[in-house]
Amino acid sequence: MSFHPALIIVDVQNDFVHPVYISSGESALEVVPVINRLLENDYKWDTVIATKDVHPKDHLSFTTSHSSTPKPSGTVVNIEAYGHVYKQTLWNSHCVENTPGCEFPDSLNGDRIEFVIPKGSDRLVESYSGFYDAIGRDNGLKAILDKKGITDVFIAGVATDICVKETALHARHWYNTYIISEAVKGSSTESHNQAIKDFRDAKIEVISEKDPILQSVRKV
């Protein structure tokens, strides 16, 4: 049986992981050394892909984008875009294009990242998943994986309960999908734990860094 593994690094950006930038929740900087180990040359990935939130400053997922008085973070609103209406949770401003918070942390060894998938760049439409945005438009990730002949997808990054989860739930339809437990962090401990349960319920494997299937990437 063929085995063609890809590493997908989800949204490891300063606004999500670095305590200097992060405005709410817990720092997730601890996942970076784990991801760096996965990026060492003895791991024979067929490709390494990073997703990246890249929002305009007036993105409609931001609390400040709906009235002169910002709505509280966590408020759910209906957004109309291109003939679709979707529900959107509002967040504090984050990962605004051309700001330091949008960039990968300096401590991330990005030399092996072959492709970067930007998402959320349309001010009207959020995109948690690396595969599709909130109204089902294609972000281009699947085309890259299929062109590379990928069979197995290993996912790291943040947040376990949001963008990691949505990316994994899409990936499972086409690839053997694995969440590397030490390499993901949630927006809270409770939401992280619930996401791990949701992965297992969806038949997505949650593995450790030492799992034989991950170690086999070194032997491809």
UniProtKB/Swiss-Prot annotation:
A GO CC term attached to the entry: cytosol
Reactions it catalyzes: nicotinamide + H2O = nicotinate + NH4(+)
EC number(s) from the headed UniProt entry: 3.5.1.19
Disulfide bonds: none
SUPFAM superfamilies: Isochorismatase-like hydrolases (SSF52499)
Keyword Cytoplasm: yes
EC class: hydrolase
Alphabetical UniProt keywords: Cytoplasm, Hydrolase, Metal-binding, Nucleus, Peroxisome, Pyridine nucleotide biosynthesis, Zinc
Binding site for Zn(2+): 53, 55, 94
Pathway in which this enzyme or protein is active: Cofactor biosynthesis; nicotinate biosynthesis; nicotinate from nicotinamide: step 1/1
Gene Ontology BP, a term: nicotinate nucleotide salvage
Domain of life: Eukaryota
Family recorded in the similarity comment: Belongs to the isochorismatase family.
Function: Catalyzes the deamidation of nicotinamide, an early step in the NAD(+) salvage pathway.
The protein, known as: Nicotinamidase
Gene: pnc1
